Amino acid sequence: MATATSIAQTLQTVPYVDLKKYAGKWYEIASFPQLFQKGCHCTTAEYTLTDKGYVTVENRCNKDSINGKQSYIKGKAFVDENSGNAKLKVQFFWPFKGKYWIIELADDYSYVVIGHPNKKYLWILSRTPKMDGTLYQQIISRTKEKGFDVSKIKTTQQK
């Protein structure tokens, strides 16, 4: 029998993601700080569909300040079968792949919340560099309900 604790710990994804609508540029609004993003400002991610069975991922940021030197990395995202396109594995360095789960997505694809089943990784992305404060707080509340430690969230400076 499942306990309330084990149910609360199971991370759910959205049922379906239309990758054509998802493709394009996203702005990082907030995230759990990661070593590989240290010193990043104005962080963006751009997803492009390919005919090769994966999505290209290009992450960019300005290092050390909003006007700092731009840094970027390219990778590939592979969709997990039978996930409704909501679970991907992202690879920036072969052979390593990281889980990329879409756990919340606006109906109009204006924002997305990406997490990892271990709840140590979290990103809130938007199609615009700024997000309405009320919407942001609602997202934070829902993220907390999903079992993420929201005290770790850091907002991302955007121009």
List the model feature ranges, each with a label.
Residues 1-159:
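A beta-rich soluble binding module of mature secreted/lumenal proteins
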